[in-house]
UniProtKB/Swiss-Prot annotation:
Subunit organization: In cyanobacteria the RNAP catalytic core is composed of 2 alpha, 1 beta, 1 beta', 1 gamma and 1 omega subunit. When a sigma factor is associated with the core the holoenzyme is formed, which can initiate transcription.
A Gene Ontology molecular function term of the record: ribonucleoside binding
Disulfide bridge positions per record: none
Compositionally skewed regions (Acidic residues) per UniProt: 1123-1133
GO CC term (a single one): DNA-directed RNA polymerase complex
Enzyme class: transferase
Family membership: Belongs to the RNA polymerase beta chain family.
Reactions catalysed: RNA(n) + a ribonucleoside 5'-triphosphate = RNA(n+1) + diphosphate
PROSITE patterns per record: RNA_POL_BETA
Domain of life (superkingdom): Bacteria
UniProt lineage: Bacteria, Bacillati, Cyanobacteriota, Cyanophyceae, Synechococcales
Name assigned to this protein: DNA-directed RNA polymerase subunit beta
InterPro entries given in the database record: DNA-dir_RNA_pol_bsu_ext_1_sf, DNA-dir_RNA_pol_bsu_external_1, DNA-dir_RNA_pol_su2, DNA-dir_RNAP_su2_dom, DNA-dir_RNAP_su2_hyb_sf, RNA_pol_bsu_bac, RNA_pol_bsu_CS, RNA_pol_bsu_protrusion
Entry keyword set: DNA-directed RNA polymerase, Nucleotidyltransferase, Transcription, Transferase
Amino acid sequence: MTQLAVPSPAAPTLPDLVEIQRESFLWFLREGFEEELLSFSPIVDYTGKLELHFLPEYRPGDPSKGYKINKPRYDPEEAKRRDATYQAQIRVPTRLINKETGEIKDMDVFIGELPLMTDRGTFIINGAERVIVNQIVRSPGVYYKSELDKNGRRTYSASLIPNRGAWLKFETDKNGLVWVRIDKTRKLSAAVLLKALGLSDSEIYDSLRHPEFFQKTMEKEGHYSEEEALMELYRKLRPGEPPTVSGGQQLLESRFFDPKRYDLGRVGRYKLNKKLNLNVAENVRVLTVTDILAVIDYLINLEYDIGHVDDIDHLGNRRVRSVGELLQNQVRVGLNRLERIIRERMTVSESENLTPASLVNPKPLVAAIKEFFGSSQLSQFMDQTNPLAELTHKRRLSALGPGGLSRERAGFAVRDIHPSHYGRICPIETPEGPNAGLIGSLATHARVNQYGFIESPYYRVENGVVRKDLGMVYLTADEEDEYRVAPGDVPVDAEGRITADLVPVRYRQEFTTAHPSEVHYVQVSPVQLISVATSLIPFLEHDDANRALMGANMQRQAVPLLKPDRPYVGTGLEAQAARDSGMVVVSRTSGVVTYVSADEIVVRPDDGGDPIVYRLQKYQRSNQDTCLNQRPLVYAGDRVVPGQVLADGPATEGGELALGQNVLVAYMPWEGYNYEDAILISERLVYDDVFTSVHIEKYEIEARQTKLGPEEITREIPNVGEDALRNLDENGIVRIGAWVEAGDILVGKVTPKGESDQPPEERLLRAIFGEKARDVRDNSLRVPNGERGRVVDVRIFTREQGDELPPGANMVVRVYIALKRKIQVGDKIAGRHGNKGIISRILPIEDMPYLADGTPVDVVLNPLGVPSRMNVGQVYECLLGWAAEHLGVRFKLMPFDEMHGLEASRLTVEAKLREAREKTGKDWIFNPEGKYCGKIQVFDGRTGEPFDQPVTVGRAYMLKLVHLVDDKIHARSTGPYSLVTQQPLGGKAQQGGQRFGEMEVWALEAFGAAYILQELLTVKSDDMVGRNEALNAIVKGKPIPRPGTPESFKVLVRELQSLCLDVSVHKVEVDSDGQTRDVEVDLMADVSSRHTPSRPTYESVTSEDLSPAAGGTFTLARRSREEDEDREEEDDF
């Protein structure tokens, strides 16, 4: 049973949370693509006799005359399985007109393939789900800025920024002159530009409100005629070329008045008209003379304190580019390339034989779209750890990417929270680290309007009464500045009258107070200003913002558990977050369930149509190796309504988000095991699979065509015993259901090897006996170090089955291995309030502290983690969860509950605890009096004695995060070295070593551990000769020789020499007569004038030594050094 703890005003259900992705892509299909095609139509050849028109009979709103999309070859599921892209072919009606003969050819032409969006707002590219992140960029338009020069005089500048094309910047200087820069080039007088545009003095003066200011500029530079001004313009922009009037004219035309080269965009025109009070038509996307005069007029007015300068971080000046627009820009790039190709073909080919199909080559457009989806910074591998991660990824706003900022150049101002973010961009959810503030998340109720500006909804307030009956009004940041807006948690009575005497309001970006009668608008919900992830944190208002940020980010890293468990204390948004994430199955119609199995649900609709079959995902692997599994919630015969959840997905229970588990926590220190945020847990969490999750890993191998012949997937692997092959079938592929450990063969593969690959002894044997040993080497796919599990699926791809394989591959085999991971020491768990920690010890149940009724606690947290971090929300949650458990209910609390009275959270929790105590009759549950209010007596499990002080105990919601110790633990004995520095590589994937850095070296220096330090910097790292000899010495039990010169020192010497610095190394020798002289040492020559570094030589036992003829005694034969050097194997030590 779920109970709303506080009778909150029914929060309006949130809008569709993935709308931003879907709407944008639909706009691209409906308008964006056609808009681009029409902007390139017609394409005329250089002589002007051939014309190619796209969409010749296009009429807005009539789809029959537009382009056509064919049915995709695969559906999304099939595309994923085949590693294909979910895309459709596009055909465009074209018309080729031959002006000489008057001949007209109409044809539908294939122009390329477009990846389609799935109904969850994602794209499937080469079998992987990807998301296009929304980009937030500076809006085109005009921006005014003021600066103080070094003499303290204020100067103003205006930048005219188009969507694409040249920037135009006007500036005033200390002498009161107006200058202009075109594309950041040299300064040019504004008078010259205006004269070059063909304006007379009187026209210029008439259009300015303060012509006297411009007079100085005209007197100094305004004596040019139009021709002279054009010559002067050409001289400034193209210095070094002979100026001509026509050249200047053409330069000006192409820079600002040619729609191909200059485009303000719809937004730019809208912003320009709004800022300068113009009424130029919206379809005029290039600059006009009126625009330029108005910009100069506004600039001059600023000198007279009329108008105001702009704040570039205000959300009225930043807009969102979603999928549709990013894709449209990419299509433009492709069509630009296509246009060049078409023109060339028109010129080269015979005009009689030309058809539109022979002119249009789909390759450039396909390449541009592929490049965007495959390698753009904004096309990201979807974060599928859990439903919330997926949802947040689709709502992310990034200031990075093409046309945006870069991490290095972004200052503090851009990253900072701006008052206009309120209700539009979440002030809390952003990454920690270099991207802080550059990547944000859309607020819960925000939406993006047709121009790309973020809007937030409000209710009107008239004479202090909230008019919900009038519906919601969406305002952009610009519009909102003019009104007094109250937050969503102002107290109102039943009639909607605001009851407070003074209300906090936002007005012109200031946070002030106002009388209810002065308020214009009120927000629709208290969670309007935060994002979805943040709004899932209960008692958010009691947490410090830094910790709330960690809490929001860590919920996205929670691993879906085996047995999902909804939180006892939630915020009421869990159901919608789960539904909109696309991981649960939602009914499309009302009807009756006729059939339910683990794999599918069949619903018979009420309108009598065909039964609808909902297929469920079973144990699929997600992008993050977690397990996607859907479980039915309905039974045959149940009635369902549209929007009802039919099946749970990963990390959901009963259609609500369930990222973690409700566990019994006690806040107390325990033998130092929870020092520094470490966490002590009970063995019960392991045995009862409370924090157990399923992970599915994918391993892949391809059999390629090599120069020496094809690689073969087979069971016949050289030098491998039958025991290692026990799990393989007759083709050498592991069977489904086999349990495999690290090093086991998954797929047997042999590669042909040439003459050079064979060691000398094998060559010798073949020379003597002439026998043809199988010249193949083992190249099988094995389970990597530290991995294990059960094989759950094997997929084989071959060309014969019609699969598309990478070039050079004959066959691809993919093996999926699943593993149940129980919680263990080293795993990271966290609450929703930024309280995270690593498990330090798992105690037996009998040793855990226990309560008065004998219940052992599950988790022991350190109480010192609360005061300094200021995330007190966790204490409220833990105590309310304690009450919820005893009352048998779940609570839903909207954050920001002060509208229900002062200290509403504390009073609510206290009231519920009292209720639980009275209802259950257990007095020890809650101690209402004195300084121990809310704490209870806890007993030591080892001794049975009560602890000295009462302890805070309750039910908290804890998440297991994806940072699992199994994926991180790593050790290296011998492994690969870097080619240049010869130092060990780093990282688990490269089988790397641990970096002994600068500071660690200082620590050993300070301690005086000279020999350990020398070993670390030479033998254990990059002294090639030394490390081989050390290995030999260890194998033979001899003393380790002295270290030599590190390779990185030689690299340093070589780099200095490459800068023409004569650097060499000398050593001092003492002659027999006591004289000293220094001798140059050649570091590059090898110790014993050998060219190759020595390899380790082992004492090895040969088969002859073991033969009975030798008397069965062991003699040790040693392979010679020369033989060693002949082995051209990779130096893997």
